[in-house]
Amino acid sequence: MRKLLLMAVAVCCSAPTFAQTDVQPVVGGYEGDLYVNVGSADYVEDNDLRMYAKVFVNASEDATGKVDFSLPNFSFMGIKLGDIFLPTIGLNAQNGVYTFGENPEVRLTFNTQEIGTILADAKLDDAQTYVKGDSIVAYIPVKWVQSETQKMPIAVLFKGVRVNPYALSNYNFNDAMRWEQSRPWDSKNGYFDWTTLKDNDEYWGQSKWQMEEYITPDAWCVSHVMGMNGLGATVVGAPYSTNGDEDNPDYAVRLTNTPNPFMPTQVVPGYMTLGTSFASASVLDLNKADGGTFGGVAFTGKPDAIQFDYSRSHTQAGDTLYAAEVINSEEPATVVAYLWKGQYKQEAVPGETAYTDPSTVTMYGRERNILDIKTTTGGAATKSDDAACIAKVVKSITGNVEGKLETIVVPLDYGKYAGTDVQPDSLNIIFAASDYFGQRSKVGAGNALVVDNVKLLYYHAIKDASYNGNEFVFGEDKTADFSTEAYVPANLQFTKVGQGATVEQTYNAETGVLTITVKGQDVRFNPESVTVYTIQFDAVKTAVAGVKADAAAEVAPAVYGIDGRRLAAPVKGANIIGGKKVIK
C-alpha cells in the first residue's frame, strides 16, 4: 500500500504544471472591421458586409487569469440589438500568441423596436480566435434562437488592432462606414431616437431636411438641431470630398453656418465636438438663444499640440442667397480644445427649442464652466475638489483658404500645469465655422469650415542645452562635439520639450559618447515618436578626471591622539588632524 501511495505521489509530481497566464498584455480596446454573415455559419470577408466596430478584452473580476470579451452595440440587417458579452474566458500564451480557452454558449436577450425581443446564443470560437501583438482576430458563432429546435446561424468575424489611447479614434473621416446617423440631444428628450421619427409624417412634413442628411462622423457630434417637431430643424454639417474621386473619395467634414429654414435671420452655427452639442431658444424671446457643448471623451494623454488640415470660405456682401443682415465676411472660424479632470456641474441649463421657457437640466462638463468663461444661461456652477483645467486653447482662424487644404498646428497651453505630473481624465475638441464664443447675432450665414486629418502631436526634443554654462546647439544630425572636454554629468543642462515625454541618458566610458534618448508619450503606438541626441566627450580626460576624483576621495588627513598614536577616527576630546589640533 505504501508503495502504491509513493508511486501516485511521484506521478502527480511529474505531471506538467502551468503558470497562470498574465492577461494584461491583451487587455484593452480594439477597433477594426466587423463582418456579419446572417443565415450562414461561414465566416466571410465581404466588403458589402463590413462595418466598423470596437471590441474589448477586460480582466475578469470573477476569476484571476481570465478575461471578459465584449462586442458593444452589435447589429445586423439594420437592426440594432445590443452588447455581446462573453465572460470569464481562459487565456493561453505561447510564442507571443494568445489564444482563448473553451467557453460555453451564453444566452443573450436583445430588445428591439423593429421586431421585438430576440434571443441569441453566442460564444468565442476558441479554435480560431487569437491576439498577436496589437492585432486581434475574433470568430464569434451566434445563433438566433427562433425556437429551442430552430436556430439561425450568424457568423460574426472581427479583425482589428489595439486602440491607440493617445490618438483620436476617427481623425481622417475617410471610411464611409464611420459616417453614421447623428443623435441630436435636447433637455426634454435626451438623445433623439430616430426609430420614433422614421415614420412620423408630421415631423418630416414640417422639416426641410431628410433623415439621411442628419449624419455625423463616428466619435464626433455635428451640431444639427431638431427644432420643434421638425419645425426649424437645421442641418449644419456634411461629408466633403477633397479629391473629387467618387470611387475612392477622401472625405473631410464641412461645417456651415446655416439659417433656420423658417426664420432666415436666425443662423444656426455649424460646429462639431468630441462631446455633445446642444441648443436652446425661446420662440417668444429669441434673445435668450444659447448653445454649446458638454462632455468629451475619456483621455489621459498629454498632447502638446493639435494638427489638422482645413479650408475656409465666407459669404460675401451682396450674395442674394442669404439675408443681408446675416452676412459676416470677416467672421473668424474657431478651434477650441481642453484637457481637464474632475467634475464640473451647472444647474438649470436650458437645452431645447420651445415656444416659451425651454426645459432645463443639470449639465456636466459644460465647456464654459471648464474654461472659466461666463455663461448667459443656467444656474449655479460648481466643481469637485479635484477639478482642474489642465491645458487649453481657443484659436481664431481668419481669412479665406479656398480650393485647397492647408495644415495648421495649434499648441496647447498647460499654464501652471506645464511640467507637472497632474494627469487629465477627459478631452474635448471643437471645430466651429463661427466665432464660437462670440455673439450669436454675428454668426455669418453660409460661412464654412472644412476640417480633415485631425492629429494630436506629442513632442520629443530638448532645448536650451548648455555645458559648463555655455549654450550650444545640436547639429541637424542631433550631434554635438565636446571632444576636448571631460564629461561631468552636473555640467550638462537642458530643457525637455514634450509634456508627456521621457528622457534617458547613457554614457559609454570607452568611447566618450553620451546618448540622450527622448521619447514622446505616444511612442508605444508611434515608433517615430523618438529623438536621439549624441554628444562626443574626451574619453581619456573623463577617465583621468574620474581617477583623480576617486583618489582625492580616498586620501583623508591622518588622525592622531595627543599621545602621538594614530587613530582610525577622531575621539572625544583633543585630536591632531592634518597637523592641527582639533577638539571634538
Report each predicted region and the residues it spans.
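Short, solvent-exposed loop/hinge segments that bridge or flank secondary-structure elements
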Residues: 27-64, 111-119, 187-202, 206-207
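Edge beta-strand at a domain terminus
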Residues: 20-29, 36, 51, 83-95, ...
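Aromatic (Trp/Tyr/Phe) and Gly/Pro-enriched flexible surface segments
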Residues: 162-307, 328-458
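Beta-rich interaction/scaffold domains
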Residues: 459-543
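C-terminal outer-membrane/trafficking sorting elements
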Residues: 15, 541-584
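Bacterial Sec-dependent N-terminal signal peptides
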Residues: 1-25
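Beta-sheet ligand-binding and adhesion/scaffold domains
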Residues: 99-165, 275-278
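Predominantly extracellular/secreted and cell-surface proteins with exposed
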Residues: 49-126
